[in-house]
Design a protein with these regions (language model features):
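A general structural signal marking secondary-structure boundaries and capping sites
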Residues: 51, 66, 85, 110-114
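Detector for the c-type heme attachment site
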Residues: 22, 47-53, 108
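Gly/Gly-Pro-rich "capping" loops immediately C-terminal to redox-active cysteine motifs
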Residues: 31-33, 37, 53-79
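Flexible coil segments in periplasmic/lumen-exposed cytochrome c-class electron-transfer proteins
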Residues: 26-30, 41, 89-128
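Bacterial N-terminal signal peptides that target proteins for export
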Residues: 1-9
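Hydrophobic helical h-region of N-terminal Sec-dependent signal peptides
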Residues: 9-15
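C-type cytochrome heme c attachment motif
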Residues: 38-49, 60-61, 78-79, 86-90, ...
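C-terminal motif of bacterial Sec signal peptides marking the signal peptidase cleavage site
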Residues: 17-20
Length: 128
């Protein structure tokens, strides 16, 4: 019995430590993007950073012009998550199709919130 209590305390401590390791969201998003933000932090943030900026992480930031829609489509993001690549392991067993869709919506919202402009947007603004 004494050892059982010790095991329970040890396992509880480990579980608390593990749950506190994942990066936490640092920005408040509208309700329609909360599910995507939550899934992003569960599956993606350990590599791509809590704010998807990639700072001090092993993976690139996703809030970057390279990942805007005209450079990297939603379908390409989906395929990258499911299939992986030489730089990124597949996340197929960690996230469902509908959760990937929510993550993509959250990323697109975050790109817009970061005021990333497409080349077309920059040209249109300079014409005014």
């Amino acid at each position: 019995m004494k050892y059982l209590n010790l095991w329970i305390v040890a396992i509880s401590t480990i579980m608390i430590s593990l749950t506190s390791c994942a990066p936490k969201p640092t920005k408040i998003v509208p309700p329609e993007f909360k599910a995507g933000q939550s899934q992003y932090h569960r599956v993606c943030a350990n590599c791509h950073g809590a704010d998807a900026l990639g700072k001090n992480t092993k993976a690139p930031g996703l809030i970057d012009p390279e990942y805007l829609l005209e450079n990297f489509s939603d379908d390409e993001i989906y395929q990258q998550v499911i299939e992986g690549s030489d730089k990124m392991p597949s996340q197929r067993n960690k996230i469902s199709d509908s959760e990937i869709t929510e993550v993509i919506k959250y990323l697109r919202y975050s790109q817009k919130a970061a005021d990333l402009l497409t080349e077309e947007d920059e040209i249109d603004e300079s014409d005014e």
